[in-house]
């Protein structure tokens, strides 16, 4: 296995585990956000099921990434979450400091996918 891909999987798993747990236990304070970002989050929070489901999914998928079990499944489930994190931080909270971690998460996801490309290749096969 490619070492960069494996390290990327572990780092991505740790990021999702830490921020998933933070979403439940809130050990990191939420930074001040622009009004547009607060409006967006307020809409999501008004659906009381959304954040517990999201954070539970992040924790479960991070455990899969860290354990090495069902990694392609975890990467596929986390892909739209990662893209939405990137879009939220680049569009609703502009600034290089806000986009650094989401960009790193996208790059880590791409690197982690490398070891599992034969599995993902089947998704793009013409039948």
Predicted feature descriptions by range:
Residues 1-28, 52, 67-127:
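Extended, low-polarity transmembrane helix blocks
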Residues 26-39:
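Peri-membrane helix termini and adjoining interfacial loops of integral membrane proteins
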Residues 37-42, 120:
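Generic secondary-structure boundary/loop-capping signal
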Residues 42-60:
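Interfacial helix-start motif at the membrane-water boundary
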Residues 60-66:
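Generic transmembrane alpha-helix motif of multi-pass integral membrane proteins
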């Amino acid at each position: 296995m490619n070492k960069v891909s494996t390290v990327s999987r572990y780092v991505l798993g740790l990021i999702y585990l830490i921020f998933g747990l933070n979403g439940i236990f809130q050990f990191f304070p939420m930074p001040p956000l622009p009004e547009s970002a607060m409006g967006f989050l307020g809409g999501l929070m008004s659906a009381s099921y959304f954040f517990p489901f999201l954070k539970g999914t992040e924790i479960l998928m991070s455990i899969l990434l860290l354990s090495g079990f069902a990694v392609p499944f975890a990467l596929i489930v986390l892909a739209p979450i990662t893209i939405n994190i990137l879009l939220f931080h680049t569009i609703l909270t502009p600034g290089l400091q806000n986009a650094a971690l989401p960009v790193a998460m996208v790059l880590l996801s791409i690197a982690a996918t490398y070891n599992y490309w034969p599995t993902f290749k089947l998704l793009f096969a013409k039948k």
